[in-house]
Amino acid sequence: MRTNYCGQLNLSHVGQEVTLCGWVHRRRDLGGLIFIDLRDREGVVQVFFDPDHQDAFRQASELRNEFCVQVTGTVRARPESQRNSEMPTGEIEVFGHGLTLINRAEPLPLDFNQTNSEENRLKYRYLDLRRPEMAARLKTRAKITAFVRRFMDNHGFLDIETPMLTKATPEGARDYLVPSRVHKGKFYALPQSPQLFKQLLMMSGFDRYYQIVKCFRDEDLRADRQPEFTQIDVETSFMSAGQVREIMEALARALWMEIKGVDLGDFPVMTFAEAMRRFGSDKPDLRNPLELVDVADLVKSVDFKVFSGPANDARGRVIALRVPGGATLTRKNIDEYGQFVGIYGAKGLAWMKVNDRAAGMDGVQSPIAKFLNAEVLEGILARSGAQSGDIIFFGADSAKVATDAMGALRLKVGRDLQLTDESRWAPLWVVDFPMFEEDGEGGLAAMHHPFTSPRDISPEALKANPVGAIANAYDMVMNGYEVGGGSVRIHSGAMQSAVFDILGINEQEQREKFGFLLDALKFGTPPHAGLAFGLDRLVMLLTGTENIRDVIAFPKTTAAACPLTDAPSRANPAALQELSIAVCAKQGSDA
C-alpha cells in the first residue's frame, strides 16, 4: 500500500511519485489549497492538494485529525522561504493527486496538544502511542534490543529460552501464581527471574547464555516498578567477577555510543561501604558533587545529646553535608528539608550557615552553635571543606537512618540548587556488598539473592559470622540508577546449604523448594557468574524520560492494573470450578 515512510522523505526523493499511508496529524484549508501534515511511525511530512485534482481535493476537504488515509503524490522541494528547519522533512513537500480515505476517526478522548491524565493515556494507549515522542521511544527500545542481540551473538552467547511456568521459590518478592487444571490444588509460579534455570544451563555446559525475558514480581506499589518487566539476562561459566564486568561494561559502552553517540569511558569501581559512607546510597549519582562527611569523633563530648548520643553509639552515625552557596537558603527552605528527611526516619535537621569562614564562631549562624566550642567548630568546618557562603546540614541518628536521610537530602539539594550536572553520564560499578542484611524480624535476609556466593570464606566460617561476610556481587550504576546487578553464584552444595541455614530455611524446606538445585550441585558444577540488566530502565535513561511507563507499550498503573483491558478482572465461575478454586469474599466487598 505504501512506497515510502513519511518521515524518511528528503531532497533525494524530489521528482519521485510516492504512495504514503498514515494519519492526518493536522489539516489547514487555505481556500485555494488544502495542506495536511501526514504522520506515520517514522515522522511527519507536509502534503498539499489543489483544485485541479478534483477528487483528491474534495476528499481532502473532508479530512479531520487522525483520519487514516493513503496519499499518492509527487515529492517537490519547498521554496526556500517556506522551508521548515524544525521538521526533518521540512525541505520538501508532497503534491498530492490521489487520496483514499481508509478510515474515519471519531473525536479523540486524548488531546495531542495538551497534557493528558495518566489514567486516560493508559486507557487509550493505542492513541497515546501515536504521539511522535511515544513512537520514538518504542523505536529506540527496538533498536536497543536488536543491538544487544548482535553484541551478545558476536561474543559467543547463546539465546536460550527458559520456562514461564515454574516452581514458586523465595527470591525476595511475592510470586504470581497460576493454578494447574490437571494437577488439582497445585500452582505454577511466573518467574521473578530465570535465575535458577540459567544456573542449571551452566551446569548443562552452555557456558555463555543470554535471554531478553519477561519477569514477574507481585511487589508493593511503587511509582517506578511494574508487575511485569523485561531483563537482559546473562550467565557465564569459568569467568571471574572481573571478567563478567568487563564484558558487560563493554556492552554498556557500545550501547551508549550506538544510541547516544557518547563515550562513557572506563567505569570506576567503588565498594558498597565507600558508596554508603560518601554518598548515602548503594547507587550513587556521581554527577552530584556533594559528599557526606563523618564527624562523630569530633562531637563525642559536646553538650548536645542529639550529636553526642549517636556519636558514642557503635550503631550510630553523625554526618555533615556541606552545600556550596547554600547560605542563601531561607528558613522556609531549611524547614522543608527538615520535613523531607523525616520521610526517612530522621527526627530533625540541624544546620549551620557559614557567613565568614575566617571569623570562626562569629562567622557562623546556627541554632546549634552554642553547643559547640571553637575547637569542635573548626574541626567540622575544616573536615567538611566549608567556605564562606556555604551551609552545612547535619544528620545524627542510627547509622541506617542518618545515612538514608542524608543520602536522600544530598540528591534533593543537588537537584534543587542545580548542582547536579545533568549534561553528563556518570557510570560506575559498586562491589563488595554485605552478604546478608537484617530482615526486621530478628533474622537475616540475602542482600541480593540466596544463590550469591560469598567472597573467600568457608561454609563453616560463614555460619560462624554471617553478618561480616562480603558477597561476590556487583551492580552497574548509571546516574544514580541501578541498571544492572549480578554476582558470582554458589557452585558448592555445602555452601548453598549453609546459606539456606543462615536464612532460616530448614533442611526439609530446602529439599521441598530447592531439591533439584541441591541435586544438580552434586554433579560437577562449574564456577559461574552473571548479571541482569533492567531493559525498561535502560531504555528510560537512553530516551531521557523519568517515567518507566513511557518506554513500555502497554504498562500497568502503580496499582498494577491495566485501564485499557480492565485487567485484572473476575474469572468465569465455571473456569474457577474446573480449577478447584473458591473465591473467599472479604466482608464489605462486592465479590
Curated annotation (Swiss-Prot):
Coiled coil: none annotated. It comes from the Bacteria. InterPro entries: Aa-tRNA-synt_II, aa-tRNA-synth_II, aa-tRNA-synth_II/BPL/LPL, Asp-tRNA-ligase_1, Asp-tRNA-ligase_1_N, Asp/Asn-tRNA-synth_IIb, AspRS_core, GAD-like_sf. GO terms for cellular component: cytoplasm. Residues 195-198 are annotated as: Aspartate. Its EC number is 6.1.1.12. Keywords: Aminoacyl-tRNA synthetase, ATP-binding, Cytoplasm, Ligase, Nucleotide-binding, Protein biosynthesis. It catalyses: tRNA(Asp) + L-aspartate + ATP = L-aspartyl-tRNA(Asp) + AMP + diphosphate. L-aspartate binds at E171, R217, H448, R489. It holds the Pfam family GAD. ATP binds at R217, D218, E219, Q226, E482, G534, L535, D536, R537. Its main location: cytoplasm. GO terms for biological process: aspartyl-tRNA aminoacylation. GO terms for molecular function: aspartate-tRNA ligase activity; ATP binding; nucleic acid binding. It is found in: Cytoplasm. Catalyzes the attachment of L-aspartate to tRNA(Asp) in a two-step reaction: L-aspartate is first activated by ATP to form Asp-AMP and then transferred to the acceptor end of tRNA(Asp). Belongs to the class-II aminoacyl-tRNA synthetase family. Type 1 subfamily. Homodimer. HAMAP family: Asp_tRNA_synth_type1 (MF_00044). This is Aspartate--tRNA ligase. It comes from Edwardsiella ictaluri (strain 93-146). The lineage of its organism: Bacteria, Pseudomonadati, Pseudomonadota, Gammaproteobacteria, Enterobacterales. The gene is aspS.
